[in-house]
Regions:
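Membrane-interface segments at or immediately adjacent to transmembrane helices
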Residues: 394-420
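Membrane-interfacial segments at transmembrane helix termini in multi-pass membrane proteins
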Residues: 370-383, 405-413
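Membrane-interface helix/loop caps of multi-pass membrane proteins
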Residues: 2-375, 381
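Internal/C-terminal transmembrane anchor helices
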Residues: 375-402
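Generic short amphipathic/hydrophobic targeting helices enriched at N-termini
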Residues: 1-2, 403
Length: 420
């Protein structure tokens, strides 16, 4: 599953495209949309599925590169991540800047400004931790950037994990010690140990600091990414499951895991005690099992179900859907649209998908696969980021603190919801 295609030495290694993984993305982002629309209690668990997928895919790519070149080209890896993630993020932030300048209430501008700066720096999750933001009250006084905490955790992973893999590769001095198999063994041990530490911290910090620290912390959510990492290492070591009985067993367990995740999505509310007493970990392991069953060469019933066109089509644009949906949901509020319930949800989702498709077709794909700047990427992206920051600062520049004692209702609500 994770073997690179035949490539000359020192070229980029690839892994084969698997439609079922697009379907998993589609199901995950659909859950998030339904949760933020107020129609699925546990739809937020889609984020954990994204974490598992990221750990699996990135580690598979790194192992494929090691197998092909006995090397990890960090600069090329980070450049690919930048081309994949930053253009759409910049477009979203420019949209938020326009919203702040033209629509947002004045008392919200400072909040948006600080959220935007944290988003650009990919530390939004830690801003949420240290500001005391309660995620489960985000519908009360929403910022259009409340959803970027998970993007921050992903980006931190993209920066740190390739360095760890490079270090694990360097532990082998020569020959077989530097093979993809040898590195996969080290990755597996590392993932299991760090995953256990992350799970322990999640349990301990919930007792010490409460749910928000656990929900937002990189250290307390890392076990989901590490579950995907461990799966990638296992598949690299063991290969695909081809024998009939083990394949059937994996399919049955995979279907059971998918049903478990579905039940959790319908029943597991965000402040449920079980969520922080092993529930998030169990859902991450279940997601990893679903991925394992879906990537086998001979498609089974689960893989075929996840490969249906509506899910895979949504999965292809899932990054844009996730990125744009929350600012659009905040903009298309009941007060502005005079809609409620399912009619409001349908309008919000329709606009989100339209924007995501346009972004995918005219921003993300051209930059990712075709267009290359005439000057170095190391100049283009920092310059673009600086322009986005300037636009955000200008868009949120109208804030003035209200006179003493004259706090508006929105401001009071925001202050109660977020100790910022």
């Amino acid at each position: 599953v994770t073997s690179p295609v035949a490539t000359p030495p020192r070229t980029r290694a690839r892994i084969r495209h698997i439609s079922a993984l697009d379907g998993i993305r589609g199901a995950a982002v659909a859950g998030v949309l339904l949760f933020h629309g107020g129609h699925l209690n546990g739809g937020y668990l889609g984020v954990d599925t994204f974490f598992v997928l990221s750990g699996f895919l990135i580690t598979s790519l790194l192992l494929a590169e090691i197998g092909s070149t006995v090397h990890v080209n960090l600069g090329a890896f980070w450049a690919r991540r930048a081309r994949r993630l930053l253009p759409a993020l910049g477009v979203m932030l420019l949209g938020v800047a326009a919203y702040a300048a033209l629509i947002a209430p004045p008392e919200q501008l400072h909040l948006i400004r600080m959220d935007a700066l944290a988003t650009v720096a990919y530390v939004a999750n830690w801003r949420a931790v240290f500001s005391g933001f309660n995620y489960w009250a985000l519908f009360t006084a929403p910022s259009p950037l409340d959803h970027t905490w998970s993007l921050a955790i992903e980006e931190q992973f993209y920066v740190i994990w390739p360095l760890v893999v490079t270090g694990l590769l360097a532990m082998g001095r020569r020959g077989a010690d530097r093979s993809a198999e040898a590195v996969a063994k080290r990755i597996l041990v590392t993932a299991v140990v760090l995953g256990a530490v992350s799970a322990f911290l999640s349990l301990a910090f919930y007792s010490w600091y409460g749910a928000n620290r656990v929900y937002y912390g990189t250290d307390t959510r890392a076990f989901a990414i590490l579950a995907g990492i461990a799966l990638a290492a296992l598949i690299a070591l063991l290969g695909p499951v081809t024998a009939r009985r083990p394949r059937l067993a994996l399919e049955v367990v995979g279907i059971g895991s998918a049903l478990f995740l579905t039940a959790a999505a319908f029943s597991l509310k965000g402040q449920s005690l079980v969520l922080y007493r092993g529930g998030l970990l169990a859902c991450s392991v279940a997601a990893a099992i679903v991925v394992a069953a879906s990537v086998q060469p001979a498609p089974g019933p689960l893989s075929k179900l996840l490969s249906i066109r509506p899910l895979t089509a949504l999965g292809l644009i899932s990054y844009g859907v996730y990125l744009y949906h929350w600012p659009i949901f905040v903009w298309l509020s009941p007060a502005r649209t005079h809609l409620h319930g399912w009619p409001l949800f349908v309008v919000r989702v329709a606009v989100t998908i339209a924007v995501a498709v346009i972004s995918y077709r005219f921003v993300e794909q051209p930059i990712r696969h075709g267009w290359r700047p005439a000057i170095r990427t190391g100049v283009v992206y920092p310059a673009a980021a600086a322009l986005v920051v300037v636009a955000l600062l200008i868009g949120t520049a109208g804030y003035r603190p209200p006179p003493h004692g004259a706090v508006t209702t929105d401001a009071a609500t925001a202050a109660a919801t977020r100790a910022r």
